[in-house]
Amino acid sequence: MANLKEIRDRIKSVKNTRKITEAMRLVAAAKVRRAQEQVLRSRPFADRLARLLENLQARMRFEDADAPLLEQRAVQTITLMAVTGDRGLCGGYNSNIIKRTEKRFAELQRQGYKVALVLIGRKAISYFTNRNYPIQATFTGLEQVPTADEAGSIASEIFAEFLSETSDRVEIIFTKFINLVSCKPVVQTLLPLDPQGIAEADDEIFRLTTKEGRLSVEAGSAPENSQPALPSDIVFEQSPDQLLNALLPLYLQNQLLRSLQESAASELASRMTAMNNASDNAKELAKTLTLDYNKARQAAITQEILEVVGGSAAAGA
């Protein structure tokens, strides 16, 4: 059995580690709430924009519209975007996206398409660069709560590639946020665009509460969108082509922003869960080590008593 000093040092190290993981859990929990609040704040605009585009498309159903972002052409080259984080310590969040990207890349290549990667996050960049995958562009340093400006800069890149016909289709692989313990990597086509609505009816929101003196998170339903329907007799001064070409890039940016927001919330939730598990494991390990320490200390005391008794017996003999 290890000596008492070694066990004491291990107990101290485990307790210090638990303090760090607990702090990281609390920070991630607070940021999850911020990420969700941002999604909810942007939802009315996203929903109204989608309805406006649907209205335009319905009116243009029998017209020959010139909207490049809606152009369906023969697909030869596909841009595959992957969204990971810049940091680790978030469970399987990054590895799940990387595995899904590798699988999708192989599927598209087997179908005869030429595939290039657009990577968001240092984890994806490091992994695919070291394995010599064809990389078209990379982006790092995004905020924990993604902004419209960040989404706009990325959207401009893929927008230019699509318009120049360097890429015939753009797909994005990101982590869809389901709840605090469940996130799912999904594949979504960004270009050509097909506006069909944005808001998810079953979204959950989370509130920070205290339970038994410890910070916890409780789930609740997202508030329903109360935006009124667009009037059917609305009149547009500009031509449908002009409106579409002005609104579609905005819609693309919004779709990309939504994907980044979902990914950010998923990463934070995964980190919070991972740090919570690490804190619990550290607590159990500290208990086990404390028990070992007490046993070792008791054994040492017993041994000392036996030595004293034995010495006394030998002296009296």
Swiss-Prot record:
InterPro entries: ATP_synth_F1_ATPase_gsu (IPR035968), ATP_synth_F1_gsu (IPR000131)
GO CC list: plasma membrane-derived thylakoid membrane; proton-transporting ATP synthase complex
Subunit record text: F-type ATPases have 2 components, CF(1) - the catalytic core - and CF(0) - the membrane proton channel. CF(1) has five subunits: alpha(3), beta(3), gamma(1), delta(1), epsilon(1). CF(0) has three main subunits: a, b and c.
Primary role: Produces ATP from ADP in the presence of a proton gradient across the membrane. The gamma chain is believed to be important in regulating ATPase activity and the flow of protons through the CF(0) complex.
PANTHER family tied to this protein: ATP SYNTHASE GAMMA CHAIN, ATP SYNTHASE GAMMA CHAIN, CHLOROPLASTIC
Protein known as: ATP synthase gamma chain
Record family assignment: Belongs to the ATPase gamma chain family.
Compartment(s) where it occurs, according to its Swiss-Prot or TrEMBL record: Cellular thylakoid membrane
A Pfam short name: ATP-synt
Main location: membrane
Membrane disposition: Peripheral membrane protein
Molecular function GO labels: ATP binding; proton-transporting ATP synthase activity, rotational mechanism
Keywords: ATP synthesis, CF(1), Hydrogen ion transport, Ion transport, Membrane, Thylakoid, Transport
Domain of life per record: Bacteria
